[in-house]
Amino acid sequence: MIQTLSKLKVADNSGAKEVRVIRNLGGSVRKFSGIGDIIICSVISATPGAVIKKGQVVKAVIVRTTRELRREDGTYIKFSENAAVLIKEDKTPRGTRIFGPIAREIKEAGFAKIASLAPEVL
């Protein structure tokens, strides 16, 4: 469960390394977001010379959380870190590579391009 002011690692090569959540999209009083949800973030740290700069406000989709996610068949899946992928306004990823595994719920949430770039979909 990701809430306002949570820090997430960036799982793509857009240039940002870490982001902080400013807002959870999807409701006026929404407190938490999970895998597949869109969030608005501020970049905490970025690689030098990248297009994405520190302090820039960006949109991202959550791809990994440390909180377990219950699936329809009763199984649970959780990851060792919280991570997000930066996206453009048309829900396509800003980077050209995705690092680490992602949950298959990302594809079901309408982010098929992110799922196709990922090295492993769990």
UniProtKB/Swiss-Prot annotation:
SUPFAM superfamilies reported in the protein's UniProt record: Ribosomal protein L14 (SSF50193)
HAMAP family the record matches: Ribosomal_uL14
Record flagged with keyword Ribosomal protein: yes
MF GO annotations: large ribosomal subunit rRNA binding; structural constituent of ribosome
SUBUNIT field: Part of the 50S ribosomal subunit. Forms a cluster with proteins L3 and L19. In the 70S ribosome, L14 and L19 interact and together make contacts with the 16S rRNA in bridges B5 and B8.
InterPro entries: Ribosomal_uL14, Ribosomal_uL14_bac-type, Ribosomal_uL14_CS, Ribosomal_uL14_sf
Known role: Binds to 23S rRNA. Forms part of two intersubunit bridges in the 70S ribosome.
Family: Belongs to the universal ribosomal protein uL14 family.
GO cellular component terms listed in the entry, alphabetical order: cytosolic large ribosomal subunit
Keywords assigned: Ribonucleoprotein, Ribosomal protein, RNA-binding, rRNA-binding
Organism (species): Mycoplasma mycoides subsp. mycoides SC (strain CCUG 32753 / NCTC 10114 / PG1)
Protein name: Large ribosomal subunit protein uL14
Gene Ontology biological process terms, A to Z: translation
